[in-house]
Design a protein with these regions (language model features):
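Extended, charge-rich alpha-helical interface modules
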Residues: 1-72
Length: 72
């Protein structure tokens, strides 16, 4: 059960990182197409912050899982 939960969480976090990276690419490639975000720079910064948040969670979970594997 632990492995299923850990794998699921790692996949979820990796997916969220990819999701927010894709949003940044969309903003960079066609900023005029995003009408609800008049401040493109702020929108990009917000997406980068979300990406960093999920990336950090992914890294921390990986460290926890590596530590638990070493402990037995």
């Amino acid at each position: 059960m632990k492995t299923v939960l850990a794998d699921s969480m790692m996949s979820y976090l990796a997916g969220k990182v990819k999701y927010h990276k894709a949003n940044v690419l969309v903003y960079l490639q066609s900023p005029v197409g995003i009408g609800e975000h008049p401040d493109i720079m702020a929108a990009i910064e917000e997406e980068l912050a979300k990406c960093a948040e999920y990336h950090e969670k992914y890294e921390i979970l990986g460290e926890i899982l590596m530590g638990s594997e070493l402990d037995g």
